[in-house]
Amino acid sequence: MINFDGIKKITERLKWKQGDEDENWAKKAIDNLMKKLIKHNKQALENLEFALRCQGQQKTECVTIPRSLDGRLQISHRKALPHVIYCRVYRWPDLQSHHELKAIEDCRFCYESGQKDICINPYHYKRVHATGVLPPVLVPRYSEKPPQEVPPTLAKFQLMEMSGSRMPQNVNMANVNFTANQFHQYNPNGIEEMDTSQKFDIPPGVPTCLVPFDKVWEEQFWATVSYYELNTRVGEQVKVSSTTITIDGFTDPCINGSKISLGLFSNVNRNATIENTRRHIGNGVKLTYVRSNGSLFAQCESDSAIFVQSSNCNYINGFHSTTVVKIANKCSLKIFDMEIFRQLLEDCSRRGFDASFDLQKMTFIRMSFVKGWGAEYQRQDVTSTPCWIEIHLHAPLAWLDRVLSTMGPTPRPISSIS
């Protein structure tokens, strides 16, 4: 018996939509599909339900609909190829064109076959890399909230039980001269002042990547935040210790560790676009760092959206590493997961220095205010946005450094002409 509700309700679990996508586009696409299958191919409806339930774990049959005159299907005034539409609805929300899809060998009615029926089974296609295609800006449909704070006494008990040691208490952020008129060209490779050479008490014989991260990193500062206008860093880098910090556009001079007011940062070379953008930052963003597991959440407090590029977040959701996520007012999203980083580090450490070193890209997060960048914007890079920040996460960077220091050098030859 066909479970119509099961096929429809799967959209309720779809977390993402593309930035220019109508809120009900996926639902309309599924309603359209239901009508076509009921009219032309009821058996295919059962095949679709089975395919969605198995999620590619078992072999499934083709799910076909009639090919239109131009091969495309119209949903909400937008035309696209049907297999692209339903692969996007059910599997890859960041999918943009048929150039990113390739049919599996068992698919008898794939789009490329040119037959009168087209298979739209999303598990009969696999994703391929398409050169020259910028990933779309994606918008979460639902918020991810940070976990509730554990009472201090319970947290202490749990930590002693887990690692035999206690995490240090938060301390106030070090004094920073916010108004220092110092400008630096953007350096994509990182932090200037962070020391990752500390010695850690790790039991002999235990691979560093398998040690709980609280044993590897016990410093009071969990991140360093840099503020940029276009490709120029403005002011000093700010080390962060408070587990909850607000970065806003106001001018609060209080340095209490829980707020960074970008309105205090001065730049004599600021243009009108930057000035106007700064006026709209407002309440900005609230960052919540969960010390117990190393995860980081961002909640947009501004009336204008914030735009986030986190390769860790993108990996979790199966997106291209350079994908930009748009977070609207009052929406919250996990932008870093330490457990995922640990799993990747464990895997990469077995594959050598180069694979492990590449994970340093996951230790920093870029975030712009008000103005976005990417496929749907005239700005193709974060350094073209008026106001943005870069967040360097200390714990994963120190953990990675510890692993790299136990490895030999890269096998790639290097010379003056390499």
UniProtKB/Swiss-Prot annotation:
Subcellular location: Cytoplasm; Nucleus
Disulfide bonds: none
Keyword Glycoprotein: no
SUPFAM superfamilies: SMAD MH1 domain, SMAD/FHA domain
Disruption phenotype: RNAi-mediated knockdown enhances tail tip morphogenesis resulting in retention of the pointed larval tail tip in adult males (also known as the Lep phenotype) of sma-3 e491 mutants.
UniProtKB keywords: Cytoplasm, DNA-binding, Metal-binding, Nucleus, Transcription, Transcription regulation, Zinc
Residues reported to bind Zn(2+): 62, 107, 119, 124
Single GO cellular component term: heteromeric SMAD protein complex
Record InterPro entries: Dwarfin (IPR013790), MAD_homology1_Dwarfin-type (IPR003619), MAD_homology_MH1 (IPR013019), SMAD-like_dom_sf (IPR017855), SMAD_dom_Dwarfin-type (IPR001132), SMAD_FHA_dom_sf (IPR008984), SMAD_MH1_sf (IPR036578)
Gene Ontology biological process terms, A to Z: anatomical structure morphogenesis; BMP signaling pathway; cell differentiation; nematode male tail mating organ morphogenesis; nematode male tail tip morphogenesis; nematode pharynx development; positive regulation of cell growth; positive regulation of multicellular organism growth
Domain MH2 per the UniProt entry, residue ranges: 222-418
MF-aspect GO terms: DNA-binding transcription factor activity, RNA polymerase II-specific; I-SMAD binding; metal ion binding; RNA polymerase II cis-regulatory region sequence-specific DNA binding
Span of domain MH1: 8-134
Protein function: Involved in TGF-beta pathway. Plays a role in male tail tip morphogenesis.
Similarity annotation: Belongs to the dwarfin/SMAD family.
Name recorded for this polypeptide: Dwarfin sma-2
